[in-house]
Amino acid sequence: MSLMDPLADALTNIRNNELQGNDSCVIKPASKLIGHVLSTMQKENYIGNFELVDDGKAGIFNVELVGNINKCGVIKPRHAVKNTEFEDYEKRYLPAKNFGILIVTTPQGVMTHHEAKEAGIGGRLLVYVY
């Protein structure tokens, strides 16, 4: 089976395991982008610890789930957003103001839309989590 979008598959795996009430999940294949998204989700307390395990191929992430995710998904197409336009996409992808995060890739790295707003930079939308 070939994967068309590993990031979308990883988030679907996390969401399905959260809905089943599992304590952990395995994400494969691993990538730098998935690692950065997971670390951003960890900073915002949506997931627990995660570790990269070398399986001789692309690698595997073992992720601890804490039960804080109601829904998460990938944003397609990956819209380019100015720092003044984040509020429009908050209304579109998040259920309420100040509830959930948008994860954005910027020239300074992967961060939440709140951090990007504070830094005054734009980027491309990757993920919504609430």
UniProtKB/Swiss-Prot annotation:
Any Pfam family: Ribosomal_S8
Q: How does it assemble?
A: Part of the 30S ribosomal subunit.
What keywords is this UniProt entry annotated with? Ribonucleoprotein, Ribosomal protein, RNA-binding, rRNA-binding
Q: Which GO terms describe its molecular function?
A: rRNA binding; structural constituent of ribosome
Q: Does the keyword Ribosomal protein apply?
A: yes
Q: Give the record's family classification.
A: Belongs to the universal ribosomal protein uS8 family.
Q: What protein does this entry describe?
A: Small ribosomal subunit protein uS8
Q: Does the keyword RNA-binding apply?
A: yes
Functional summary from the UniProt entry: One of the primary rRNA binding proteins, it binds directly to 16S rRNA central domain where it helps coordinate assembly of the platform of the 30S subunit.
Identify the InterPro entries for this entry.
Answer: Ribosomal_uS8 (IPR000630), Ribosomal_uS8_CS (IPR047863), Ribosomal_uS8_sf (IPR035987)
Q: Which GO terms describe its cellular component?
A: ribonucleoprotein complex; ribosome
Could you tell me which NCBIfam families the record lists for this protein?
PRK04034.1
Q: What is the lineage of its organism?
A: Archaea, Methanobacteriati, Methanobacteriota, Methanomada group, Methanobacteria
List this protein's GO terms for biological process.
translation
Name its species: Methanosphaera stadtmanae (strain ATCC 43021 / DSM 3091 / JCM 11832 / MCB-3)
